[in-house]
Structures are given as C-alpha cells and as structure tokens.
C-alpha cells in the first residue's frame, strides 16, 4: 500500500464499485494497462473481483480496445469456482450505465446539480469541513459506509480528522447475529455446506442470496443425500427446493429454537463428551429451557409440536454433520427485538450437536494478518478524544462495536445530542433506503450543513447531497 494518499486519490478509490470499477477511470494496475494498450482486434483477459455485492466472486473481464465486452467467472477463484450469479453477470451494466456518475456534482438549487471538477470539489469540501471542525469540533463529522476493502483507509482518514464517528450498514443488516455468535463462541463461524448431512435454515434463502460458492456447495450436499429444512414464513425458492418447508409465524424463530434445545437436552440427544469438555453453562441452559416445550413453542410459532420434536431428533441423529445456519439475515438478522437472543440460541443448539470444527458442521476461518493502516510509514493520527455519537461499545450499548448504530443517526442529528452533527459523508451506502423511517432520515439529512455522497448513481441519499 502507498504510504501517502491524497484526498483526491482516496475519494476516487472510494467510488470504485460495480463489477470491475465505478469511479471515473479504470484502476491502474498491470492488467488494465495492458488492456488499454491492446489493439482493436485483441481481446485480453483481466482477472478481477466482482463488486456487485460484498462476496466479491472472482471474475475475468474480457477487454477489447480498452472496453470491457464480457465478464466471466474465474475458474481459479477458490470460492466461486468460475460461476457468477445474475447480478455478477450484469456487472457491465453498472460500468456502462448511461446514468452512471462520472464526475462530481454540486447542488445549485432544489433538485438541481451541475458538474464540478475533482479539484474544486475537494477544495470546497475541505474548506467546509475545516470550518465545521473549527466551530463544533472534529466529532461533528460522521462517515457512513458499507464494509468494504477500503474500510481501513476510511478509519485512518477519520482518525486523522479527529472524529470517532465511522458508522455504516452493518447494524441494519447482520450485526445482531455477528454479536450473538461472537459473544457465545468468540467468533462468527460458517457452515461446512458441502459436507452437511442435515441442514436447518432459519430464514436464509440460499438460492436467491448472494453467496455463489455456498449455493454450489449446498447443491452438492443435497446431491449426496443431505436433508435440507427451510424455516421460513415465505415459500422462498430455497423453501420450495428444500426437502421440507416449515412455514413459521414471522419473528418467532427464538421459540422454535428453544424448543429444539429443550427436546435435545430432555431426551439426552446432545453430544455429551463435547458438552462436558468444551462448553460452560450447560446446567444453566438446561434450567433455562425447562419450560420451553414443543407444545409451548407450537402455540407461538404455528409449527405442530410433533414436528418440532421430530426436527430436534433428526438433527441430533445426524450430528456432528448437522447444522443450524449462522445465517446472514434470516431469523436473527437485524430485524427483530430478540434477534441477538435468537442467534445465541442457534449457537447453543449447534454446540449441543457437537458440530464446532466437525466435518459437515460449523467452521472457523483462520485469521490472515494483512497489516494495518496505522502501521504505515509517515505521520501517525492523533489519539481521538471525543466519544462516539452513538455510544457504541459503552455502557448503554456494550456489544454494539465495530460500525456502531447507524439507525440511531437521524435522532442524533435532529436532537443535537450528545453533540451537534453537522457533516455526513456517505460512501457505498444508501441510508435513505437502508435505514428505518425514511422520512426521519430525510429530515435529518436536510438539517445537515454538509452532505457528501460518494456513489456511482444518483441514489436516494445522493439526491439530498
């Protein structure tokens, strides 16, 4: 990584999205330089990563005369194995969309924008940020983003500015399940989809989801005889394809999982050796679920008690190659009041199956150390003195670390507490659409003195910049 980045380079890199890119120019690495130099009839193959979602499948861009003419999957990519979903195959539409923003735009009236140069945009944004920082302190700036490869640079930039307020998408998507598994296991595991023999999906719709490689593996597992059970209020594509669909009442997954735990413990179907050697709190869990019978759960979930008991026994019979999915959204994404506890119940259930680290169970990925931006050569950012605007990680929200609680941002902007938030930079994120209560989000955006939207389209949020 370069030790010195200009503001212009940083913000232009922030714009990179779509299948191959989405800033105003192609990334300047060797493959693209060769593509630019190629003759009109020569087609070059340039490996890259798909940016149409966060999974980042491997792609090969076919380039003729400096223009991408086709996108294929990269067969050497270890996860996607040369396959692309419909969104990935459509990546060129983002790259060459006639409505794609190719240069900065400045508001000149209600709903009116005019082009402005990069230098002028940086100069005006920098001057306004400097003025607001002098009036209200560096914490007056919030940077709202999506978890992407550029996040370390965003964090580094905010530290240099002096603001602790880097926030974003996670809390409106998957933070609750991440917190649930991290507080139970210490980390968020995945599922060994290719070898699972019994798979329970609490609301996860694999066939219409974004994990290309996971779909390939679960299809292979079913071909080998795995039993797939979909727990979902909706007859999704996955539910229709699974061996069994359980049409649960929305938001009642916790009751269902607690009843499964009750049956497995009451009938001593759990992995006793694993529980004795590698868990703590079993007796407390046993006492806690004593009254959570299948009959109790049936009245809440609309799933027959006999079905709940059968599913519990089938899961236990297939252990350790049985798994309750750790999901993405599903029954314990950031959608329900009890989502964290639902995720914790799923974690406890998997532990009772003794499937942690087992073939066909849950898997933990090794941590790869790639270095940190604060270890780069050059000036070190000063220690940030201000508290976060949302109190994430503190007494009120001790588990809400990382990117914090973006859904609370409109209230903070409108109330001015705990301090005034006057500037917001939004990158790879559309809070008007993603956050609850869009009207309140819009009201908050209109109260700001500076809103900068880094996007390739005139998104719902960019329209208020």
Where are these regions (language model features)?
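Core structural elements
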Residues: 312-321
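Alpha-helix capping and helix-loop boundary segments enriched in small/acidic/polar residues
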Residues: 116, 184-190, 205, 209, ...
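Flexible, glycine/charged-enriched surface loops at secondary-structure junctions
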Residues: 136-140, 270-275, 321-325, 357-364
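A glycine-rich phosphate-binding loop feature that marks nucleotide/adenosyl-phosphate handling sites
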Residues: 146-147, 277-279, 328-329, 362-373
């Amino acid at each position: 990584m370069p030790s010195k980045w200009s503001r212009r380079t940083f913000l232009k890199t922030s714009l990179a999205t779509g299948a191959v890119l989405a800033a105003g120019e192609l990334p300047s690495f060797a493959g693209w330089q060769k593509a630019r130099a190629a003759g009109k009839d020569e087609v070059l193959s340039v490996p890259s990563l798909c940016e149409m979602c966060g999974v980042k499948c491997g792609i090969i861009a076919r380039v003729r005369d400096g223009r991408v003419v086709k996108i294929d999957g990269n067969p050497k990519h270890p996860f996607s194995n040369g396959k692309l979903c419909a969104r990935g195959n459509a990546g060129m539409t983002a790259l060459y969309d006639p409505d794609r923003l190719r240069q900065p735009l400045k508001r000149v009236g209600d709903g009116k924008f005019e082009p402005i140069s990069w230098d002028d945009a940086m100069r005006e944004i920098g001057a306004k940020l400097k003025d607001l920082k002098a009036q209200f302190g560096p914490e007056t700036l919030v940077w709202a983003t999506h978890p992407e490869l550029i996040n370390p640079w965003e964090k580094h930039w905010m530290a240099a500015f002096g603001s602790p307020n880097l926030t974003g998408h996670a809390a409106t998507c998957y933070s609750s399940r991440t917190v649930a598994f991290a507080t139970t296991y210490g980390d968020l595991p995945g599922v060994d989809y290719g070898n699972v023999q019994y798979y329970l999906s609490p609301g996860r719709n694999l066939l219409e989801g974004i994990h290309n490689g996971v779909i390939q593996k679960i299809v292979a597992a079913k071909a080998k005889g795995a039993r797939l059970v979909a727990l979902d209020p909706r007859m999704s594509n996955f539910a229709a394809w699974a061996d069994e669909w359980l049409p649960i009442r929305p938001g009642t997954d916790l009751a269902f999982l607690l009843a499964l735990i009750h049956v497995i413990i009451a009938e001593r179907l759990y992995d006793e050796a694993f529980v004795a050697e590698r868990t703590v709190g079993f007796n407390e869990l046993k006492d806690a679920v004593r009254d959570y019978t299948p009959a109790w759960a049936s009245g809440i979930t609309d799933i027959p008690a006999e079905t709940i008991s059968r599913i519990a026994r089938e899961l236990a019979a297939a252990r350790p190659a049985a798994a309750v999915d750790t999901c993405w959204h599903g029954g314990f994404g950031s959608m329900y009041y009890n989502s964290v506890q639902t995720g914790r119940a799923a974690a406890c259930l998997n532990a009772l199956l003794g499937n942690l680290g087992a073939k066909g169970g849950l898997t933990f990925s090794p941590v790869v150390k790639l270095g940190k931006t604060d270890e780069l050569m050059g000036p070190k950012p000063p220690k940030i003195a201000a508290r976060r605007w949302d109190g994430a990680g503190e007494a009120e929200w001790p588990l809400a670390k990382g990117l914090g609680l973006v859904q609370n941002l409109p209230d903070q902007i409108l109330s001015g507490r705990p301090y005034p938030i006057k500037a917001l930079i939004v990158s790879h994120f559309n809070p008007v659409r993603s956050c609850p209560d869009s009207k309140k989000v819009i009201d908050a955006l209109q109260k700001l003195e500076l809103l900068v939207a880094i996007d390739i389209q005139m998104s719902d949020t960019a329209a208020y910049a």
